[in-house]
Regions:
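SAM-dependent nucleic-acid methyltransferase catalytic core
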Residues: 2-18, 24-29, 73-213, 227-230, ...
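Short, polar loop motifs at secondary-structure junctions
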Residues: 38-43, 154-155, 247-250, 291
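Short His-Asn-centered micro-motif
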Residues: 36-38, 56-57, 170-172, 189, ...
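Short, acidic/turn-prone active-site loops that include or flank metal/cofactor-
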Residues: 58-62, 194, 266-273
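Class I S-adenosyl-L-methionine
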Residues: 257, 261-292
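Conserved S-adenosyl-L-methionine
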Residues: 30-87
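Conserved Class I SAM-dependent methyltransferase catalytic core
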Residues: 224-269
Length: 292
């Protein structure tokens, strides 16, 4: 059986940042509940394999995949097998249009999760992107036709890890997730990143340039970054240990530093991005605040 690891590729994924993240964890992280309001592929979760976790993301199909993997892995594997068999009966573009058209349809977690995984395995560079109406609109990778959608060993390995943990897995807002955290928790927040191209760093700045790529229908703004830092600071005041990441812009650094966070910058590697210029070695901001 393959070892557990991220089962989807996600923009901004933390896999290549793990050494920098692990170096900034609290010494008692194994004793704390793990809280992640921007879960994505969950690279840090898979590295830590916490026994207790509160996991959330605004992308509902993604969270359906996580829940299915935790609660109905057999059903998830079955549905992925159905989609893989269907792919062999259609042209690849026709199959892709069919499956992406089902992403917003109702269904069981296994059905919705399988659609998400199949599309993630088939879209260009694993790039989850939606339009202003919230509908998925990333392009098909024409070289994806031979990829295994099921990856049974990997998914079964992930399911074993999830089955052994006390998990709360929901599609909920980051605000609600952080508000539920406090004493004894460790929060890892990896939100959409700030961008210097936004112009003057005002608290009411418009949508971030990075949100030319949308993860959800609601664009992320600098006002959201301020609200996030405030929410994380309040959680630290309640006793949580907080670690957040971002681009090392002057604005992001000031937002976190002014709220009592220790701000550091380190070079990491990223391989999934809408912008090819941001793949490879990039500087990343790490903001930590220990529990009060």
């Amino acid at each position: 059986m393959a070892d557990a690891a991220p089962f989807v590729r996600w923009v901004g994924g933390s896999q290549k940042s793990l050494p920098a993240l692990l170096a900034r964890l609290p010494a008692d992280v194994a004793d704390r509940r793990y809280v992640d309001p921007f879960l994505g592929g969950g690279a840090l979760f898979w590295a830590l394999r916490p026994q207790r976790a509160l996991l959330s993301d605004a992308c509902a199909p993604l969270m359906a995949a996580w829940r299915a993997l935790a609660l109905d892995p057999v059903g998830l594997l079955r549905e992925l097998g159905v989609l893989q068999a269907l792919r062999s009966t259609r042209s690849l573009p026709e199959w892709y249009r069919l499956v992406t058209g089902l992403l917003d349809e109702d269904g069981t977690d296994a059905e919705r999760g399988a659609r998400l995984i199949a599309v993630n395995r088939s879209c260009f560079n694993g790039l989850w992107r939606v339009n202003g109406s919230g509908r998925f609109n990333a392009a098909l990778d024409p070289a994806s036709g031979g990829r295994d959608l099921v990856r049974e060993d990997l998914l079964r390995g992930c399911a074993v890890v999830l089955a052994g943990a006390d998990l709360d897995v929901q599609a909920r807002s980051w605000e609600a997730t952080i508000e539920a955290a406090g004493a004894g928790d460790f929060i890892y927040a990896d939100p959409p990143y700030d961008d210097e191209d936004d112009g003057p760093p005002t608290l009411l700045g418009g949508p971030l340039a990075v949100q030319g790529h949308r993860y959800t229908a609601q664009a992320w703004t600098r006002g959201d970054l301020v609200r996030l830092a405030d929410a994380l600071a309040r959680a630290a005041d309640r006793g949580a240990h907080v670690l957040s990441t971002n681009n090392p812009t002057a604005f992001a650094g000031e937002v976190f530093a002014s709220r009592g966070f220790t701000v550091e910058v380190e070079t990491v590697t990223r391989s999934v991005s809408r912008d090819a210029s941001t793949r490879g070695a990039v500087d990343e901001l790490y903001a930590t605040r220990r529990s009060s």
